[in-house]
Design a protein with these regions (language model features):
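Short glycine- and Lys/Arg-enriched binding-loop motifs that mark or flank ligand-binding interfaces
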Residues: 8, 88, 117, 130, ...
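Generic beta-structure capping elements
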Residues: 26, 38, 150-152
Length: 171
């Protein structure tokens, strides 16, 4: 089910590393897979790629962000059983809990897809005194730039989804 090794991805390109993390099946104790452990140089490369992508992402239309998130929903749904099995192996979760976490992943991306086209500003009434008659304030929500996340290990799909999906939705 799992590949022998997994790279890390930077700017949509697979990256290998000199150091790998062994991942053991929590039930059998056997080696399940190995994943690349990025070094400081790879982290700097990822940060540079994120900074470079900031403007194009800011200009990415809400409907396009929605389409990306909906594509994720579709792909996660197709691979639901595979994702649940990987959670069982990697995190030691019972299959029922793992399946529930995959469902939550899908729901989080679905909700983010729905909200991607609803992230708007506000019109504020500033007519708080006679001298302010006809005054209004306007807000507009705009992406600020790259974000970084640190998530705990106990819900690896769910807790990452709660950071990544809204970030994509917001641009």
């Amino acid at each position: 089910m799992l590949s022998k090794t997994y790279p890390c991805y930077i700017a949509n390109q697979p990256q290998t590393s000199k150091t790998q993390l062994d991942v053991f099946d929590k039930y059998s104790g056997k080696l399940a897979t190995r994943v690349a452990m990025p070094d400081a140089k790879a982290v700097e490369k990822a940060i540079a790629a994120a900074v470079k992508a900031a403007r194009p992402m800011r200009e990415f239309k809400p409907w396009a962000r929605q389409a990306v998130l909906q594509h994720c929903v579709e792909r996660f749904s197709v691979r639901r059983d595979e994702l649940a099995e990987a959670l069982c192996i990697e995190a030691g979760k019972p299959i029922k809990d793992a399946a529930g976490e995959v469902t939550r992943l899908i729901e989080t991306f679905r909700i983010a897809a729905e909200e991607a086209v609803r992230i708007n500003g506000e019109t504020l009434n500033l007519e708080l005194a006679a001298r302010l008659d006809g005054y209004h304030g306007y807000t507009r929500r705009v992406p600020l730039g790259p974000v970084s996340f640190i998530t705990p290990f106990n819900f690896p799909l769910n807790l990452v989804a709660h950071k990544v999906a809204p970030a994509i939705a917001a641009g």
